[in-house]
């Protein structure tokens, strides 16, 4: 059967449940995924004086073809975007500034250092998101930044975050879509602290300073991201979930939930509905934690589907900013972007193709047998045929055909790049 014939047959199956497949695809097309640039170069960035990767983050593997220049990274992103249906966004860290080989400190970064990124995004019709980089730097060597007891170090990082908000504002003005500028810090202690309050008090004061400059939300949205623990901060993290949730609600900022930043038995999908009751908008970094915050490539597993379902069921496609955050140097990096982003979009499509209203009614009426039965039966409904048709409509490869494009790109481009030292 052809793609169209499969689509028509699948469409009929869904229409029996009152599901408007064409409307579902229209909604899906409007959802941008923020694709993180750092998968392409193992979070190295382009600083003249690069620091070793720190902040409790680790990238393993040494697959050939890592991007080593801004041009290579943008070229790789373009390749991935050509294989992913829809119009999306690219998420940058401050270490991806282009300073023309001049050593520019992070607290001195300006919009001009990201002009090439903006021109590129404008040409492709992309939005840009941003992150200050509070790791891989000598002033973060002891694992403390915005909560540091040394006021000089603290001030340096405050200035860096202020500079990054201005860069985010620049992105938003130039591209006509608000930039999400997200702050994550590695601050914490390896062993049991004797004072949990004072570092958090300093962090609160630092954030107050950073956000004191009024920037229109038409151009820049601020988010803050928590974490349960990291390498070197196993016992205590200053920016805990409770801290940032309270700060975000009190100060009208977005709380960003990273799917790898909680206890392995906690799920972000279970938090979304609670958050939506108290905030107009929230942000996600979708990753795949394997026993810890390992940042594996996103796969179409139960939790990814549940995240998508919570967004769709609660009519929150415009309220939740969906970003990705994973990095794997053991596989083709362009393929990693492609696999992870396509899976995020697949999960959203899956959620859009469920009879969510009827399933809610079953729950309200206490008809739990039917609820479970239908939720399970829909797992084998022909959503793949709808996905294939959507990919064809969007002009991207259907099924695994994209993999042949990746293999060709690897042979013609990636394997011709100079080998780099392994990161293990």
UniProtKB/Swiss-Prot annotation:
Enzyme class, UniProt record, top EC level: isomerase
GO molecular function terms listed in the Swiss-Prot or TrEMBL record: L-rhamnose isomerase activity; manganese ion binding
Binding site for Mn(2+): 261, 293, 295
GO biological process, one term: rhamnose catabolic process
Co-factor note (free text): Binds 1 Mn(2+) ion per subunit.
First-listed, main subcellular location of the protein, grouped into a coarse class: cytoplasm
Catalytic activity: L-rhamnopyranose = L-rhamnulose
EC number: 5.3.1.14
Metabolic or biological pathway: Carbohydrate degradation; L-rhamnose degradation; glycerone phosphate from L-rhamnose: step 1/3
Subcellular location: Cytoplasm
Keyword Transferase: no
Record keywords: Cytoplasm, Isomerase, Manganese, Metal-binding, Rhamnose metabolism
General function of this protein: Catalyzes the interconversion of L-rhamnose and L-rhamnulose.
HAMAP family: RhaA (MF_00541)
Protein family (similarity comment): Belongs to the rhamnose isomerase family.
Protein name in UniProt: L-rhamnose isomerase
Gene behind this protein: rhaA
